[in-house]
């Protein structure tokens, strides 16, 4: 019998040489009720669990007859499930977002938001899609796809980057038995001045093994530490902007987020924003309540704010959020935080494909005066070696040198290891994926084809601004304007939302994708780019990086200091989104006094204008005895022998009607034009006022 005091489930699992997940599954099968791996069990319960597991193991070792019936039932169930799945067939020229949206019955804007939030893929209305993007969309909505064979007729159109990424997806799906655990990659987030950088520095200074004398003089953007014989990789650039940009580019590197909240300050605006980004990415969150060494620290109050403002319930309060009180300054609680990171990694089964060509994600890139183009990466799969041919975004190269996080030269890098690569022809885009290919020649060919493809798609990459909304044509009756709102205070955000909601109408939906407090950042721009939205800022500035990115991505960013001006601009944009209303205007009347038959022309009416005018570019109705006999266009209009555009009363004129010769003397004519009149939406507030009247 194992002697032990009261302990948590994960600690018991460790003593039994099991993973917490395996133990939880065993306990569930045995009927033992525990909430999570953080639940406590007392000594008596622990010994009962051990006895039950030993008995279960003894039974498992006894030979048993195969349950054929169950297998058949499972096969039948699988067949039924497959039948239930919806399937669509696409032609090669139908790989466009608007066409796919129509085929699967999901609005474009809904697809754009779902793909950005859930899968980190940025799409635009009507965008020509890669096959892999189509598969991701259909996977999200559980729809099978079939592409007609003629797709393969043009090899030139295949995106090699898409095939490289698909290679790893297939490995993960078809060769699960070859996947092995890898060290977790952690991003630290939180409000400014809550201690993100101090925590990263504390972990680095106390845990990085074999630091060279004099310290590390250069950071490569990430580092690895060792805890109880296991490794953890930390991205050394805290903040959710980097995190969001990675997601937007489909190159997410983070496995776990540590959300830092100061015990003396509580949950603040950037805490909420960071949490929303982590939650949207479906990444496990561990909360580190920092600064517990301060006199005014209040851990319990901070936990209460986690519940009230974020919906994060600590495990000790019956929830499933791991909360660790720490002091990054003194080091108190940091070891426990690291242990919790390893525990969460184990529970989430973070794995990789350890063999074959490497795949990595770029976390930093720059042009170094001495070394040339360099890229700091975290290896995701395979082994990256010196001499490998690589491609990334818009460039390629051969790995000339590799440096680890201590800037020491190495020959190979393994999954989750941060390294610096030298050897790219140009500086690769930060946050993009790196792939190893068979040769430098192949790498060059892949990138050249991609650059040609990108150039061809350049025109489709421009986003809308408020003026261009006036020219927008959408495939649906109801139009949608996506908005990202940023303001100086939560009070201002509430006021903006209230004002904007009053502009809702039955013709146009105003969709607030995100609303927050603080300056307009790169993450706001990336989100706006993903949903083809407009950013509206109230009493906030646009940071320089965001301004540059907005120009690059073609995202419209507007800032205001007066709320009514923002509302007026928005009203104008909404009016511009509506197609003009066609209004008929009667401009004159006349009477046919004489009918002339002209060879090769037909019948021409001699008309006396009674009032108003006749317009050559307008329309006419012909009435006989009060009955409408013709409505259509004027083919020709003459005053005497001269072709004219307009004839006014009381003049006479000759008219040839388009496609109609059955005219008689005495027929009455009504002339009219169709004018396009700017249409105004019926806003919610105005509609309510009208109903009251």
From Swiss-Prot:
One cellular component term from this protein's GO annotations in UniProt: cytosol
Chain positions covered by the region annotation G1: 190-197
Annotated segments matching region G5: 327-329
Keywords: Cytoplasm, GTP-binding, Initiation factor, Nucleotide-binding, Protein biosynthesis
Domain tr-type G: 181-349
GO molecular function: GTP binding; GTPase activity; translation initiation factor activity
One Pfam family linked to the record: IF2_N
InterPro entries listed in its UniProt record: EF-G-like_DII, IF2_II, IF2_N, P-loop_NTPase, Small_GTP-bd, T_Tr_GTP-bd_dom, TF_IF2_bacterial-like, TIF_IF2
Superkingdom of this protein's organism: Bacteria
Chief localisation class: cytoplasm
Region (G2): 215-219
Ranges where the record places region G3: 236-239
Subcellular location: Cytoplasm
Family from the record: Belongs to the TRAFAC class translation factor GTPase superfamily. Classic translation factor GTPase family. IF-2 subfamily.
Physiological role: One of the essential components for the initiation of protein synthesis. Protects formylmethionyl-tRNA from spontaneous hydrolysis and promotes its binding to the 30S ribosomal subunits. Also involved in the hydrolysis of GTP during the formation of the 70S ribosomal complex.
PANTHER family reported for this sequence: TR-TYPE G DOMAIN-CONTAINING PROTEIN, TRANSLATION INITIATION FACTOR IF-2-RELATED
Name the record gives this protein: Translation initiation factor IF-2
Gene: infB
């Amino acid at each position: 019998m194992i002697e032990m005091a009261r302990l948590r489930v994960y600690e018991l699992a460790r003593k039994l040489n099991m993973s917490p997940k395996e133990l939880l599954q065993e306990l569930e099968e045995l009927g033992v009720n525990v909430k999570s791996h953080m639940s406590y069990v007392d000594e008596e319960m622990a010994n009962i669990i051990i006895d039950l597991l030993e008995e279960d193991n003894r039974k498992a070792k006894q030979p048993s007859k195969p349950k054929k019936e169950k297998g058949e039932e499972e096969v039948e169930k699988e067949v039924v499930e497959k039948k239930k799945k919806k399937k669509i067939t696409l032609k090669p020229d139908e790989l466009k977002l608007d066409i796919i949206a129509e085929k699967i019955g999901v609005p474009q804007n809904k697809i754009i938001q779902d793909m950005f939030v859930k899968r980190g893929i940025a799409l635009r209305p009507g965008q020509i899609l890669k096959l892999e993007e189509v598969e991701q969309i259909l996977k999200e909505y559980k729809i099978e796809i079939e592409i007609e064979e003629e797709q393969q007729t043009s090899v030139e159109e295949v995106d090699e980057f898409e095939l490289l990424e698909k290679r790893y997806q297939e490995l993960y799906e078809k060769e699960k038995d070859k996947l092995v655990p890898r060290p977790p990659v952690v991003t630290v987030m939180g409000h400014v001045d809550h201690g993100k950088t101090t925590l990263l520095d504390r972990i680095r200074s106390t845990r990085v093994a074999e630091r060279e004398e004099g310290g590390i003089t250069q950071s490569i953007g990430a580092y690895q530490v060792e805890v109880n014989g296991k490794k953890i990789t930390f991205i050394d650039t805290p903040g959710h902007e980097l995190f969001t940009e990675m997601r937007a580019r489909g190159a997410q590197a983070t496995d776990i987020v540590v959300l830092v909240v100061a015990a003396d300050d509580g949950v603040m605006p950037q805490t909420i924003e960071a949490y929303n980004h982590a939650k949207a990415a479906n990444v496990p969150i561990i909360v580190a309540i920092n600064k517990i060494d301060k006199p005014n620290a209040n851990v319990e109050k901070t936990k209460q704010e986690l519940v009230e403002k974020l919906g994060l319930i600590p495990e000790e309060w019956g929830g499933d959020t791991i909360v660790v009180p720490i002091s990054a300054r003194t080091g108190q609680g940091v070891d426990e935080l690291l242990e919790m990171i390893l525990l969460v990694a184990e529970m989430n089964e973070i794995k990789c494909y350890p063999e074959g060509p490497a795949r990595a994600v770029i976390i930093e890139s720059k042009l170094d005066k001495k070394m040339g183009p360099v890229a700091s990466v975290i290896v995701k799969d395979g082994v990256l070696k010196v001499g490998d041919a690589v491609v990334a975004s818009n460039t390629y190269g051969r790995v000339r040198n590799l440096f680890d996080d201590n800037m020491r030269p190495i020959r190979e890098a393994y999954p989750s290891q941060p390294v610096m690569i030298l050897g790219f022809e140009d500086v690769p885009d930060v946050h993009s994926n790196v792939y190893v290919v068979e040769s430098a020649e192949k790498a060059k060919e892949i990138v050249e084809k991609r650059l040609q493809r990108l150039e061809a798609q350049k025109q489709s990459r421009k986003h809308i601004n408020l003026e261009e909304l006036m020219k927008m044509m959408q495939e649906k009756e109801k139009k949608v304007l996506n908005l990202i709102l940023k303001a100086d205070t939560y009070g201002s955000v509430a006021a903006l939302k209230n004002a904007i909601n009053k502009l809702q109408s039955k013709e146009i939906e105003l969709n607030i994708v995100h609303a927050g407090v603080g300056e307009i950042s790169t993450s706001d721009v990336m989100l706006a780019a993903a949903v083809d939205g407009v950013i509206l800022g109230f009493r906030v500035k646009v940071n320089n990086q965001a301004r540059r990115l907005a120009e690059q991505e073609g995202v419209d960013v507007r800032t205001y200091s007066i709320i009514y001006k923002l509302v007026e601009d928005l009203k104008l944009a909404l009016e511009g989104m509506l197609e003009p209303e066609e209004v008929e205007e009667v401009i004159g009347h006349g009477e046919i006094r004489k009918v002339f038959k002209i060879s090769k022309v037909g019948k021409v009416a001699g008309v006396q204008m009674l009032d108003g005018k006749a317009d050559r570019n307008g329309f006419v109705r012909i009435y006989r005895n009060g009955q409408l006999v013709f409505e259509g266009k004027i083919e020709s209009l003459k005053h005497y022998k001269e072709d004219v555009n307009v004839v006014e009363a009381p003049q006479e004129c000759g008219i040839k009607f388009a496609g109609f010769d059955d005219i008689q003397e005495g027929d009455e004519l009504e002339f009219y034009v169709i004018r396009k009149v700017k249409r105004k939406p019926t806003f919610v507030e105005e509609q309510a006022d009208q109903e009251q009247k």
